[in-house]
Amino acid sequence: MANKLRKSNAIEWATATGTVPLLERSCCHSEDAALEPQASKTSHREQAPILRHLSQLSHLLIIAGLLIVCLAGVTEGRRHAPLMFEESDTGRRSNRPAVTECQFGKVLRELGSTWYADLGPPFGVMYCIKCECVAIPKKRRIVARVQCRNIKNECPPAKCDDPISLPGKCCKTCPGDRNDTDVALDVPVPNEEEERNMKHYAALLTGRTSYFLKGEEMKSMYTTYNPQNVVATARFLFHKKNLYYSFYTSSRIGRPRAIQFVDDAGVILEEHQLETTLAGTLSVYQNATGKICGVWRRVPRDYKRILRDDRLHVVLLWGNKQQAELALAGKVAKYTALQTELFSSLLEAPLPDGKTDPQLAGAGGTAIVSTSSGAASSMHLTLVFNGVFGAEEYADAALSVKIELAERKEVIFDEIPRVRKPSAEINVLELSSPISIQNLRLMSRGKLLLTVESKKYPHLRIQGHIVTRASCEIFQTLLAPHSAESSTKSSGLAWVYLNTDGSLAYNIETEHVNTRDRPNISLIEEQGKRKAKLEDLTPSFNFNQAIGSVEKLGPKVLESLYAGELGVNVATEHETSLIRGRLVPRPVADARDSAEPILLKRQEHTDAQNPHAVGMAWMSIDNECNLHYEVTLNGVPAQDLQLYLEEKPIEAIGAPVTRKLLEEFNGSYLEGFFLSMPSAELIKLEMSVCYLEVHSKHSKQLLLRGKLKSTKVPGHCFPVYTDNNVPVPGDHNDNHLVNGETKCFHSGRFYNESEQWRSAQDSCQMCACLRGQSSCEVIKCPALKCKSTEQLLQRDGECCPSCVPKKEAADYSAQSSPATNATDLLQQRRGCRLGEQFHPAGASWHPFLPPNGFDTCTTCSCDPLTLEIRCPRLVCPPLQCSEKLAYRPDKKACCKICPEGKQSSSNGHKTTPNNPNVLQDQAMQRSPSHSAEEVLANGGCKVVNKVYENGQEWHPILMSHGEQKCIKCRCKDSKVNCDRKRCSRSTCQQQTRVTSKRRLFEKPDAAAPAIDECCSTQCRRSRRHHKRQPHHQQRSSS
């Protein structure tokens, strides 16, 4: 086995998304000359050990790079593990059992494509690693896998002695050699002419067309038992490498759970799990029309060939994992009439007694109807059917084709064509006939019934109503002024679709359309310069929206809609066309399958060069948990643009905002997707407030912005928690740093971390944000002692009283109405601002210091004259007992007190207020014999708004650590010097002599020996140092 690996020079590493061969030799940095074999054998032997070590190091770097890039692919691959049947509808499940494209990092690669491995920084593009997306069969499925190999050994030998390595090349070349020696990459180039010719396809799915599902190898995978004779028809549109599909199914059965695309051999090429809930699909359009819509994105080149050669089959699956109910299949084929199709019909065998005639088992059909309502109106009918022939009718079989008004039993069309060679699977029959405008009107409203039966055996009959065509499509437009000189700010959007009964459902949204101008909204037909009004939609206009339906739609309107000649016009009393737009058809899938689009509005501060800029955006999340979006712009000049998704938890002041760049683009149209978006971000699209923004890439200016409606997220895309530790906003771990984005939500707005504010619910409460949680506390008013000339007064709107002159208090009490005088208003606005809080002149308050709350030991005041803020701290009285006996009555008490019965007189106590060298609790009460000016004039010192006399000593107080008793400061001739207390060796020896053995013999009433806390700490540190010293000396001597 080892020999085989050495011969192949590759080690295969299997992942969920592919088998990635890792090279056994370094090939990516070919410019390193040390890795190349030298011409001389002697030099080669000398460099062999170096090459071996460099090769091993290169292996590790390549493996690490591929692991990083493919890590996301591994996770995605596990999500898309192949499953034949759907799991429980309520749990997470894989929604793409067959994967027809490779995901390398976050880049999708087409099946059959090749590329150089890009490992990102710091490795970059590895030009000697060639990767390929290959098809690997796995349990009758084709699964795409990535395979990479070393192509350095495939380089041709250089024709010179000193070849060089060029940037972006793997193989070395000779200087001046213009021939490219690199291995050419096989990049499939699409043939535009080929794709233009393969656009419209259709399929009929009945029991008879599902013949290949009944083979011996397929019986274990599919159930074809169909007692109700369920049939279905499909339409396909191939557009820009994507295959859009639409299905009409029988009303006798519910919505299928999956769609498969298989080849002639029954190998599954692609499988899509359909979105189903208890109430049906989440799609508004599919619920309204009863259709099944979707798209197969990026069809590989090999599969396009299968589609072009009519070798592709489609399979509908019903049931679940426990029970497979039914599987219907049909061949996807081209039909010329599909290009002009206006109506469709699904033909089924009748069930008179709830049972199908055994001779009609597996019978069904579909009709492709094209009409023209000109001067000579006509109808073209293409029938695709089976099962209406007798056993002996094997040639030239006669049929009866009827179109009738079932309500009146009035036959409108009746012909008897003949089929030369009847087939048990597919028969195609084309008929044409003139038809009246009245009958076309009945056809457009779904009133006509089409019947195909055998002329010889009339009981062999299939029938169905003619309805709007089976294709899933909507028609949309942007509403904007058509004149560049227009000064209006009005804009809007419109989108419509056809129901099966022929009614036209419309949705119109406008912006800056004033109802006072009596707007008139109408459907118009635009043919050149002529504009004809067809329908008036004004009665349904309300609050900038017009939502409704046009029940009786004429054939002319229907033809104009499909031809792209129908538009929406908004007029006013002064302008016949304020804003308008022409409806354009779009297939329904992915982003356009959401509930409704959003209007991207021009911002007020936007540059005046884009006065009529407007946009429309669709956004949805598919069944594979990928985000899809589509943006259409109008009035935006050609430039490089950026599409951003903005998210905030709720619409509130100060809410945290996150922005994600979805894509950079240019032009007026963008259709894209975002793969592997985390579940936590997907759920925000449904639960949070989201905006879609279009920015200019160069100027960084916001051009358009629109608010997303609630985007529905499939249940299996929600985040899954594996334990009970569900994260709760506000939970925190003290060992972790506070996130800078942490905010608190209170009273309808957000506040930043450590921010303080007054509660909007109670203005006498102060709140603060700490670790994502808001805490509020009632304002504590300081105890005030007013002067004899002042009076305690509490004004309206203030939480605490303040001392004001008696005259001002009397005037305030006599005043019955609020101040209207300018002088009074100015006087009310006078005050001080501390932080973000305003305090009126003369007010006093305790500072709010979270998380401890109000500091009641400090009282701040706003000077009524100078508006200066002073915050002196409370001066504690001297203690009348030993400091060891003193205590604080509660945790927030400012001063210590002595226990009852422990006070001692000032004469008998060692510490007296007159001794400046002894410090008491917080500050000592000194006799105010001199003013501050006199103290400073006599050589005193001022430290932090506190005055010390010349020669006075004290311990400094730090706000974060309290009083520093081991540091002593002294004021000497207006200069402050601070020193830390130093302990001698004798002091430390004296401290250690007080042992526990001596304490046993001490009397209980004896005073405890004094222990200096500062010296004890220094002595312990010194002892530890001496204990370690012999060990170090021993190591040094050894």
Swiss-Prot record:
It comes from Drosophila melanogaster (Fruit fly). Palmitoylated, probably by Hip14. Cleaved by metalloproteases tok and tld. Cleavage by tok during pupal development contributes to specification of the posterior crossvein in the wing. Component of a complex composed of dpp, sog and tsg. Interacts with palmitoyltransferase Hip14. The chain crosses the membrane at residues 54-74. It holds the Pfam family VWC. Coiled coil: none annotated. Gene3D superfamilies: 6.20.200.20. It is a single-pass type II membrane protein; Single-pass type I membrane protein. This is Dorsal-ventral patterning protein Sog. Glycans are attached at N179, N287, N520, N666, N752, N821. Belongs to the chordin family. It is found in: Golgi apparatus membrane; Cell membrane; Secreted. GO terms for biological process: amnioserosa formation; dorsal/ventral pattern formation; establishment of protein localization to extracellular region; imaginal disc-derived wing vein morphogenesis; maternal specification of dorsal/ventral axis, oocyte, soma encoded; negative regulation of BMP signaling pathway; positive regulation of BMP signaling pathway; posterior Malpighian tubule development. GO terms for molecular function: BMP binding; collagen binding; growth factor activity; protein sequestering activity. InterPro entries: Chordin, Chordin-like_regulators, CHRD, VWF_dom. Residues 75-1038 are extracellular. Changing C27S: No change in baseline secretion but eliminates increased secretion normally caused by coexpression with Hip14 and reduces intracellular levels of Sog. The keyword Zinc does not apply. Keywords: Cell membrane, Developmental protein, Glycoprotein, Golgi apparatus, Growth factor, Growth regulation, Lipoprotein, Membrane, Palmitate, Repeat, Secreted, Signal-anchor, Transmembrane, Transmembrane helix. PANTHER family: CHORDIN (PTHR46526:SF1). Residues 1-53 are cytoplasmic. Putative negative growth factor. Antagonist of dpp, a protein involved in patterning the dorsal region and in the development of the neuroectoderm; dpp inhibition is enhanced by tsg. Required for establishment of a narrow stripe of peak levels of BMP signaling in the dorsal midline of early embryos, that will give rise to the amnioserosa. During pupal development, plays a role in specification of the posterior crossvein in the wing. Exhibits both agonist and antagonist activities towards BMP signaling during pupal wing patterning. Abuts the dorsal dpp-expressing cells in a lateral stripe 14-16 cells wide. Later in embryogenesis it is expressed in neuroectoderm and in the endoderm spaced along the anterior-posterior axis of the developing gut. GO terms for cellular component: extracellular space; Golgi membrane; plasma membrane. The gene is sog.
